[in-house]
Amino acid sequence: MAEITAALVKELREKTDAPMMECKKALTEAEGDLARAEEILRVKLGNKASKAASRVTAEGLIGLFIAADGKQGAVIEVNCETDFVAKNPDFIDFVNKLAGLVAAQNPADVAALSELAFGEGTVETTRTALVGKIGENISIRRFQRIATPNALASYVHGGRIGVLVEFAGAEEVGKDLAMHIAATKPKALNADGVAAADIAAERSVAEQKAAESGKPADIAAKMVEGSVQKFLKEVTLLSQPFVKNDKQTVEQMLKEKGASISQFVLYVVGEGIEKKTTDFAAEVAAAAAGHA
């Protein structure tokens, strides 16, 4: 049996971020074998999960699922730290199965989803094990489920953009709508659905531009209103020019096809997540200073 030295305990702690006493116990159980001790901690403490939990997850994958009858569907975003892991087969399988689980079980939120049975354990134990296996933090960010008497369509672009659409009409219309939404990324179905904060921000910019133009107050007011209305047309699905025929709007296309859309969900991986940027020059300088 190898001697359990302080240096060995320290090395194991640095690798796993496990408590010092747990590291010592694992090394004792492993008879001083560092690799075996690390495996023991992986099983006991979820491996690197605790260490990885503080790291930013801004990459990831969008999972989509529609039931065989086409009446229930779900879209989910699961994040990881790097694009490399987003292409890992185990990660992809985890995300796609989660989408199916959401559609089938209709959990209230991420916490409820995490407690559901999954494989030989729960969603959370599976996630933790995957963190240990892959070595990156993995987080379930958001999901949405739709159940409808009508029809559902979906589209995923490169695993990073996912769309789920509830509609009534021919199957081709649903596919066209999903692809259009992925391409143009509307904020809402119509003007009523656009967030007040987004409209206020656009109005503020328009007012500043109008003030700088030096135009009379009445003309400036019309300029502001015109800018806001243009913005709403650009970000609302029904008002957008249809991507397959920009001479008609999406609303006109739907009317022509005798179809309608009730709602849509659009997820873009990492949208709104602040990514950590590394200043490598500063990092190297700090490392050099530490060795000075």
UniProtKB/Swiss-Prot annotation:
Annotated gene: tsf
Compartments, record wording: Cytoplasm
Gene3D superfamilies: 1.10.286.20, DNA helicase RuvA subunit, C-terminal domain, Elongation factor Ts, dimerisation domain
Statement: the UniProt record of this protein carries the keyword Protein biosynthesis: yes
HAMAP family membership: EF_Ts (MF_00050)
Job of this protein: Associates with the EF-Tu.GDP complex and induces the exchange of GDP to GTP. It remains bound to the aminoacyl-tRNA.EF-Tu.GTP complex up to the GTP hydrolysis stage on the ribosome.
InterPro entries reported in the protein's UniProt record: EF-Ts_dimer_sf (IPR036402), Transl_elong_EFTs/EF1B (IPR001816), Transl_elong_EFTs/EF1B_dimer (IPR014039), Transl_elong_Ts_CS (IPR018101), UBA-like_sf (IPR009060)
Family: Belongs to the EF-Ts family.
Domain of life: Bacteria
NCBIfam families reported for this sequence: tsf
Organism from which the protein derives: Bordetella avium (strain 197N)
Region ranges (Involved in Mg(2+) ion dislocation from EF-Tu): 82-85
The protein's name in its UniProt record: Elongation factor Ts
Keywords, alphabetical: Cytoplasm, Elongation factor, Protein biosynthesis
GO molecular function: translation elongation factor activity
